[in-house]
C-alpha cells in the first residue's frame, strides 16, 4: 500500500482530485490552473481514440474539455497496485511522478502525471507532463487471470473433441477466414497476434520461412541481441530468470516456437503473401496466399497487419563496376558466417551494426577484412553506454516500466536522450578518439540525441561496439572511405589513387529499403500513397503509421524491437477490437475526431 503521509503521494492525490473536478466543470479556469505553461499531454487512445501529443498548456486546454465531455473520464486516483508516487529526475528536471488509474464510458486506463513547481505562480505544483493510456475495453477484457478460459469445452465431454482436436481445427481455417491476417512471424507478428488472441479476435499469422523463428535463426552466426534481457520480453510470457543478459539469436528463435505453442497462436509457415486488394463497400480484403506445396488460398480478412519489421526489402545500391567483380557478392541479409572465408580477402561496405558484426565475424574466422564507410556513423559501447536508455528497466515491474516509457512525450524524450548521449560520449571518449585517429567518421545523431533516435528516425546508422571498433583502432580491420573508390574491377575495389583493395568477397551491409516500398509491392501504388510515409516522427510527434490506424482502412503496421512491439501491440489490438465491437468506426482515418 502507498504511504499516504509521503509528500509525493499527497501532491499526486491532490492534483488528481482537482483534475477530475475541473474536467466536470464547463469553465476552464480551474483546469488552466493545474497545467504548467510548458506542459505536455500524450493521449494513447484513452480520451481521443488517437495516439497523439500536445505541447503547451494552451493546446491542451483547447483539446481536453470537449474530449472529456464526450468520453466522460472519471475515477482519477493514484493506483495503489503500481509503483508509489516518487521524486524523480526526467529529462534533467526534478519532478514528482505518479501512476494513476481512471475509467471512461468505454474503458479503463492508466496514466502518469509529473508535477513541477510553477515559479510564476508561487511554486504551486502543476502538471509538466500527463499521459492517459487506454488499458482495456469494458465488457471485452483480456482473457487473463480470473477471465481465463475454463476449458470445459474439451475437459468435461469424453465423446467430443479434445484440446488438440480443437487447436488443429482453429489453426486449419478449413471452412472460415480469419478476422485478422498478420503478415510476418517475428516479434511484431507474435506480439500483435498474442494480444488479439486474448481479446478473442480470430487471427492468423503467415510467414514464408520454413520454421517459426527462422527470421532470427537464419541471421549471421555470431548474432546476439544488443539490448538486455529485461527489456525484451514478449507479452504475457517473461523469459526465464536464468536466461543470459544478451540473448543469442538461436535461443530467441526457439523461444518464438515455444511462445506460439504456449499462447495457442495460429501460424502458417512456408506461406507467401502474394498481395491483396480492399473492397471498400464490403470493408474487407481479398488476399492471396501461396502455400509450400504451391497451392493458393484466397482469404477475406477484415484487417491485415503488416508485421515484417523496420527492415524490409534489402537495399542494394548501384556501385560502379561491381558487376565486373569476379568474387562473391552478397547482401548482409544473406550472410551466415565466416567459416568458408578463412585466409580470404573480404570487403564489407557499410558501418552499421550488421557491417561491423560481419566484419568482426570474418576477421575472427581468419579472413583479411577491409571496411568501407559510406557515411558517418554513431558508435557507442554496448556496456554501459548503449544500455543507459534502458536504465528504468533495471528496477520495478515490466508493466510499470512500459507505462513510464510510454509516458515520455517526444520533446522530453529528445532532451533526455541528448543528456544520455553526452554521458555516453564521456564514457566512450578513449574509443571515439581512437576511431577518429583511424579515419572513422563519427556522428552523434540528430541534435546529439544518440542512437535510439537514429533508430526511430531512420532505422539505423549506428553501431553497438562489441569489439569491432577496437579492431579498427588497432588496425586489425582496415578502414577506408567508400567515396575514395573509383570503380570495382574483377580483382576488387580500385581506388581513386590508383591502388586496388583486392577481395574474394564483397558484403553489402547497405541496409534496407523503406517500408513504403513493401506496401507498394504487396498492395499497389494507390494504397501506398493512401498510407503515406512510414516510420520517423510526424507532425503529431508520433511514429508515422505505427500501431495506429493508417490512411487505408483495414491496413495496420507494427515494427520495432521487442519492447516497442510489446507496448505498441497493446494499442493496436485495442483499436482492432474496438472496431470489431462497433466502438470505433471501421473506415475512420488516423487523425479523425471520433471521441
Where do the PLM segments sit?
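Short, low-complexity N-terminal intrinsically disordered segments enriched in polar/charged residues
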Residues: 1-37, 167-177
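A solvent-exposed, acidic/Ser-Thr-rich amphipathic alpha-helical stretch
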Residues: 11, 21, 25-92
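Short beta-strand edge/turn micro-motifs at domain boundaries
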Residues: 99-168
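Flavin (primarily FAD) cofactor-binding/catalytic cores of flavoenzymes
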Residues: 133, 178, 201, 206-208, ...
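A short, basic/flexible loop-to-alpha-helix module at the beginning of a structural domain
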Residues: 153-178, 330-342
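Glycine-rich Rossmann-fold phosphate-binding loop(s) that bind the pyrophosphate
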Residues: 183-190, 208, 351-352
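Conserved N-terminal glycine-rich FAD pyrophosphate-binding loop of Rossmann-like flavoproteins
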Residues: 210-238, 377-401
Amino acid at each position: 500500500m502507498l504511504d499516504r503521509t509521503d509528500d509525493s503521494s499527497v501532491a499526486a492525490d491532490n492534483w488528481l482530485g482537482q483534475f477530475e473536478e475541473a474536467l466536470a466543470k464547463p469553465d476552464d479556469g480551474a483546469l488552466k490552473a493545474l497545467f504548467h505553461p510548458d506542459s505536455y499531454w500524450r493521449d494513447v487512445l484513452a480520451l481521443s481514440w488517437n495516439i497523439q501529443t500536445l505541447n503547451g498548456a494552451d493546446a491542451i486546454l483547447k483539446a481536453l474539455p470537449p474530449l472529456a465531455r464526450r468520453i466522460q473520464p472519471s475515477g482519477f486516483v493514484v493506483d495503489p497496485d503500481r509503483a508509489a508516487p516518487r521524486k524523480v529526475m526526467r529529462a534533467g528536471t526534478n519532478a514528482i511522478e505518479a501512476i494513476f488509474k481512471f475509467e471512461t464510458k468505454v474503458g479503463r486506463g492508466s496514466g502518469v502525471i509529473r508535477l513541477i513547481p510553477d515559479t510564476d505562480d508561487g511554486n504551486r505544483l502543476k502538471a509538466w507532463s500527463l499521459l492517459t493510456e487506454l488499458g482495456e475495453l469494458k465488457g471485452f477484457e483480456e482473457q487473463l487471470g480470473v477471465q481465463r478460459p475454463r476449458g470445459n469445452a474439451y475437459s468435461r465431454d469424453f465423446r467430443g473433441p479434445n484440446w488438440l482436436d480443437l487447436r488443429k481445427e482453429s489453426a486449419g481455417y478449413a471452412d472460415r477466414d480469419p478476422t485478422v491476417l498478420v503478415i510476418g512471424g517475428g516479434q511484431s507478428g507474435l506480439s500483435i497476434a498474442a494480444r488479439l488472441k486474448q481479446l478473442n479476435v480470430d487471427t492468423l499469422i503467415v510467414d514464408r520461412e520454413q520454421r517459426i523463428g527462422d527470421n532470427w535463426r537464419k541471421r549471421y552466426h555470431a548474432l546476439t541481441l544488443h539490448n538486455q534481457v529485461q527489456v525484451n520480453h514478449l507479452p504475457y510470457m517473461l523469459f526465464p530468470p536464468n536466461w543470459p543478459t544478451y540473448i543469442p539469436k538461436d535461443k530467441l528463435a526457439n523461444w518464438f516456437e515455444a511462445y506460439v505453442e504456449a499462447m495457442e497462436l495460429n501460424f502458417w509457415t512456408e506461406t507467401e503473401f502474394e498481395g491483396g486488394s480492399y473492397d471498400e463497400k464490403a470493408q474487407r480484403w481479398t488476399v492471396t496466399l501461396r502455400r509450400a506445396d504451391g497451392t493458393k488460398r484466397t482469404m477475406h480478412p477484415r484487417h491485415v497487419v503488416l508485421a515484417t519489421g523496420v527492415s524490409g526489402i534489402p537495399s542494394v545500391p548501384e556501385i560502379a563496376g561491381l558487376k565486373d567483380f569476379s568474387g562473391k557478392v552478397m547482401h548482409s541479409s544473406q550472410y551466415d558466417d565466416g567459416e568458408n572465408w578463412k585466409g580470404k580477402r573480404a570487403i564489407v561496405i557499410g558501418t552499421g551494426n550488421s557491417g561491423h558484426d560481419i566484419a568482426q565475424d570474418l576477421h575472427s574466422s581468419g579472413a583479411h577484412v577491409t571496411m568501407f564507410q559510406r557515411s558517418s556513423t554513431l558508435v557507442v559501447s554496448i556496456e554501459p553506454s548503449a544500455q543507459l536508455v534502458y536504465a528504468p528497466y533495471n528496477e520495478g515491474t515490466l508493466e510499470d516500466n512500459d507505462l513510464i516509457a510510454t509516458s515520455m512525450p517526444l520533446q522530453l524524450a529528445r532532451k533526455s536522450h541528448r543528456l544520455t548521449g553526452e554521458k555516453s560520449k564521456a564514457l566512450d571518449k578513449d574509443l571515439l578518439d581512437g576511431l577518429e585517429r583511424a579515419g572513422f567518421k563519427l556522428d552523434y545523431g540528430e541534435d546529439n540525441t544518440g542512437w535510439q533516435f537514429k533508430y526511430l528516425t531512420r532505422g539505423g546508422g549506428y553501431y553497438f561496439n562489441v569489439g569491432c571498433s577496437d579492431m579498427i583502432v588497432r588496425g586489425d580491420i582496415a578502414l577506408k572511405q567508400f567515396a575514395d573508390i573509383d570503380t570495382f574491377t574483377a580483382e576488387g575495389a580500385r581506388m581513386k589513387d590508383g591502388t586496388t583493395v583486392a577481395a574474394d568477397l564483397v558484403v553489402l551491409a547497405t541496409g534496407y529499403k523503406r517500408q513504403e516500398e513493401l506496401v507498394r509491392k504487396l498492395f499497389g501504388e494507390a494504397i501506398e500513397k493512401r498510407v503515406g510515409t512510414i516510420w520517423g516522427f510526424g507532425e503529431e510527434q508520433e511514429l508515422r503509421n505505427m500501431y495506429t490506424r493508417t490512411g487505408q482502412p483495414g491496413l495496420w503496421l507494427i515494427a520495432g524491437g521487442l519492447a516497442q512491439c510489446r507496448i505498441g501491440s497493446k494499442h493496436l489490438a485495442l483499436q482492432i477490437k474496438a472496431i470489431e465491437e462497433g466502438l470505433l468506426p471501421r473506415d475512420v482515418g488516423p487523425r479523425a475526431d471520433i471521441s
